[in-house]
Amino acid sequence: MSTAAVLVYPDFFKVAVSSAGNHDNAIYNRWWSEKHSGVKEIISEKGDTSFLYNIDKNPDLVKNLKGKLLLFHGEIDNNVHPANTMRVANALIKANKRFDMKILPTQRHGFGDMAEYVFWGMSDYFAKYLIGDNTERPVDLEEMNKEIEQSGNKKKQ
């Protein structure tokens, strides 16, 4: 949704970070699209029923990008296929649009033990492009994972 927002309303949204984004409903679960984006039932004069999905695809909207965009995706995402992000990246490149992208090796949809890395990556990106803070904050994933284990919270893998 963040990518769609920066592409549909480019004069309002200046920065977006997409985390395992569903950029093209044609290659995602139809039930999700129907539930969250709506579907229009059309009954012909003969009584035949068809359904209209009028959901814009982010790759078709990339020409509108004016702001900054960071795309994250897990290499083995088992919910939203990485092809969703690859399609929007391909369209952005063909439209000669600048963007940032990070593919997280061995990670699924929730980013597993790299979730903190993604969180701080998003934080740094927003700080840099919204308030001009270019301070890089190193993320010690091993230390963060130790702290999580010591606190008794279990991480999803």
Which residues does each predicted region cover?
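Active-site-proximal cap/loop segments of hydrolase catalytic domains
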Residues: 1-157
